[in-house]
């Protein structure tokens, strides 16, 4: 009985940890994470007032927003640190269209308490697949042995919205809004946005912009833009309940073909099913 209870506890912790990892990979790429769980829906709040920025700077950033949005996809390399809870690296390609986010990332845990939890199950990295309606995470063999041999955990966004406490709802909204040009949209609402200057970023001439967004839960957003009005680099800094949040992302190969296949149904466990089994 004790062994069964311990197994259930581990499974529950991992299901939550994997959700946190999926959030962390993209946490800095849009305004959604800055909302509290109890706040009104994000899109209404963002459209209730006009952008704070006007003039030549606004025109320049809107050109970046349009160009990045039209590109539709890019290769991504990112590092994320969330206080003492989690640090990770992610590499892959993501696409953004009207129907949402798609793509595949390889996520490597590099530190923090969440990483320690995953390492205890023999998992130091995972594959994450983002589809318009769901997020999938591939675990290792040791975890699969605990859940009937299935390696993939499935998180349907609509189901996440029903989670208690509001955390799932924030994740679902974030996944639908996660694109590089969301950072530009955020800067267009910043009152202190400024052009820092011209810099070389990964061997390319770029223009550096910086500003503070998010109101009471302010984050600093910095972007570096090339001569095609495409983001080359983005850095976001702020605070979370677990400490300082810092994410650095690099973008390249805009327009790259992106695909993400659904894992085999027989090798996939729905997160709701896994959580429900904890009370059985």
Q: Which ranges hold each PLM region?
A:
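Short, hydrophobic/aromatic-rich segments at coil-to-beta transitions
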Residues: 70-77, 99-104, 115, 202-210, ...
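N-terminal leader/targeting segments and the immediate start of mature chains
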Residues: 2-102, 272-280
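Acidic/charged, solvent-exposed loop-and-adjacent secondary-structure segments enriched in E/D, K/R, S/T
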Residues: 132, 136-178
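Beta-turn initiation residues at beta-strand->coil junctions
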Residues: 78-80, 106-109, 139-141, 235-240
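Extracytoplasmic
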Residues: 69-73, 98-100, 123, 130, ...
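Gly/Pro-enriched, hydrophobic low-complexity segments
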Residues: 198, 204-266
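N-terminal beta-strand/beta-hairpin edge segment
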Residues: 89-137
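A short, amphipathic edge element
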Residues: 185-194
């Amino acid at each position: 009985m004790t062994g069964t209870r311990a197994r259930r506890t581990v499974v529950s912790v991992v299901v939550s940890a994997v959700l946190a990892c999926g959030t962390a990979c993209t946490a800095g790429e849009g305004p959604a994470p800055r909302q509290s769980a109890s706040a009104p829906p994000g899109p209404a709040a963002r459209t209730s007032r006009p952008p704070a920025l006007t003039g030549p700077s606004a025109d320049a950033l809107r050109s970046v927003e349009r160009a990045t949005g039209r590109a539709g996809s890019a290769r991504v390399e990112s590092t994320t640190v969330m206080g003492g809870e989690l640090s990770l690296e992610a590499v892959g390609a993501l696409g953004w269209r009207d129907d949402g986010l798609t793509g595949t990332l390889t996520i490597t845990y590099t530190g923090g308490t969440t990483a320690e939890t995953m390492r205890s199950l023999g998992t130091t990295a995972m594959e994450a697949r983002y589809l318009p309606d769901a997020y999938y995470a591939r675990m290792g063999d040791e975890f699969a042995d605990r859940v009937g041999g299935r390696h993939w955990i499935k998180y349907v966004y609509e189901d996440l919205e029903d989670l208690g406490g509001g955390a799932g709802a924030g994740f679902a909204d974030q996944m639908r809004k996660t694109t590089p040009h969301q950072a530009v949209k955020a800067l267009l609402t910043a009152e202190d946005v400024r052009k820092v200057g011209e810099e070389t970023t990964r061997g390319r001439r770029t223009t550096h912009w910086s500003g503070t967004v998010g109101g009471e839960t302010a984050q600093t957003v910095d972007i570096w833009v090339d001569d095609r009005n495409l983001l080359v680099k983005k850095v976001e800094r702020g605070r979370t309940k677990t400490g300082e949040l810092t994410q650095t992302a690099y973008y390249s190969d805009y327009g790259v073909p992106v695909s993400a296949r659904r894992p085999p149904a027989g090798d996939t466990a729905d997160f709701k099913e896994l959580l429900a089994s904890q009370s059985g």
